[in-house]
Amino acid sequence: MTQLYIQDVTLRDGMHAIRHQISPTAVARIASALEAAGVNAIEVAHGDGLAGGSVNYGPGSNTDWEWIEAAADAVTTAKLTTLLLPGIGTVAELKRAYSLGVRSIRVAAHCTEADITAQHITMARELGMDVSGFLMLSHMASAETLAEQAKLMETFGAHCVYVTDSGGRLTMPMVRDRVRAYRDVLDSHTEIGIHAHENLSLSVANSVVAVEEGATRIDASLAGHGAGAGNCPLEAFVAVADLHGWGHSCDLFALQDAADDLVRPLHDRPVRVDRETLTLGYAGVYSSFLRHAEAAAQRYDVDVRSILIEAGRRRLVGGQEDMLVDIALSLST
């Protein structure tokens, strides 16, 4: 039987959906519910990872440390996880997260820049952490190129490497090709993960295809709480996993209750496929650009979709949020 590792991202990717505004009390409540529902791991951080709170990415209502401490106090069995983007988060932040109880780290880079993760992956392994490599915007590299980058992360020490569909742009054949390419080059003991977004309404389908091709770590969030149209909805994926007979440790009804009772009430903007979020996937734009693009569109009185299409044409990547204002200004003149 296929046995899955369910990695919740409600309290990290989900931060984008609420502009990184959530109290430690709410974090603890959600983390406790997730553990009770049986997820293997719970990721906690600013949406852009450790030290992501900034003018460019958006300040958080609290520090990463306050959120992590709240989650650490609330869980005992689920593995506390966080995300780090080299260039934003540093080895110092990694060590501090470890001191607060984080035992799993995902080290993220643009899909063609795995080389910048070596120091952080190596340090995490020295600390004894579970380490995953996170190749963002995986649609922007061919399956072969992506697999080469995944192999680099493996040589640095990653236990798992993800196909990370940050733009919600991958289709099912594209996911299949990328996971197969990973499996062809990675050692048999190295796990493969899938991080899907719902922008094209394919997050569950793409996650299923990934599992069929050998992925075992699945990123998902309560009510799909995440950037853009959201992540793979945890409760929906678990229901499908049950229908496929795949092994996991989750309680479907408990996930449904947590999604509807704890997470949906947090939304100040619906997390769904709509004209703006669909355009993210159609254009292949980083999902976390949504709220930044909407703000720029309102400021300069232009259609947010036009901004997103141009961002896709320019192949903008994470960290270039400021360019959305430049695009909006150009469109308004």
Curated annotation (Swiss-Prot):
SUPFAM superfamilies: Aldolase, post-HMGL domain-like. Keywords: Aromatic hydrocarbons catabolism, Lyase, Manganese, Metal-binding. One of its GO terms (biological process) is L-leucine biosynthetic process. Mn(2+) binds at D13, H195, H197. The record marks R12 as: Transition state stabilizer. Its EC number is 4.1.3.39. The active site is at H16 (proton acceptor). Residues 4-256 form the Pyruvate carboxyltransferase domain. GO terms for molecular function: 2-isopropylmalate synthase activity; 4-hydroxy-2-oxovalerate aldolase activity; manganese ion binding. It comes from the Bacteria. InterPro entries: 2-IPM_HCS-like, 4OH_2_O-val_aldolase, Aldolase_TIM, DmpG_comm, DRE_TIM_HOA, PYR_CT. It catalyses: (S)-4-hydroxy-2-oxopentanoate = acetaldehyde + pyruvate. Gene3D superfamilies: 1.10.8.60, Aldolase class I. Substrate binds at R12, D13, S166, H195, Y286. It is an enzyme of class 4 (lyase). Belongs to the 4-hydroxy-2-oxovalerate aldolase family. PANTHER family: 2-ISOPROPYLMALATE SYNTHASE 1, CHLOROPLASTIC-RELATED (PTHR10277:SF9), HOMOCITRATE SYNTHASE-RELATED (PTHR10277). This is 4-hydroxy-2-oxovalerate aldolase 2.
